[in-house]
Amino acid sequence: MTFEVLGRDIIQFNFNNNVTSELSFSSIKGVNIFRVIQEGINNSIKYANATEISVNITESDSKINIEVADNGSGFDINSTELGNGLENMQKRIDEINGEISIHSENNKGTIIKITCDKNRTNVV
């Protein structure tokens, strides 16, 4: 999908859901996962001037893995003061006992990886 965002050039959005099982999360867990993905996309648009943003969701036996990646300007994670958005992402993932990692380099984009336990519910 491509969208014009905030009057800027068109941004290519790619969404890949490779989860085959039926998943059910508590409202707290679901909202926290949603908000972290939302913040990652918002940062890509607002700060990185990305022209392509990808969200990839995969699963293992007990984990769900989410990756938000962009081709934007990136940043030096060691010399950048983390703002409220990145701190809030960490707090949200901590709240659901998950893990988050952020990899970024100047002019090479950013990759945010989230891993958390999945709760399985058989839905008829």
For each feature predicted by the language model, list its residue ranges.
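Coiled-coil dimerization/phosphotransfer module
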Residues: M1-V124
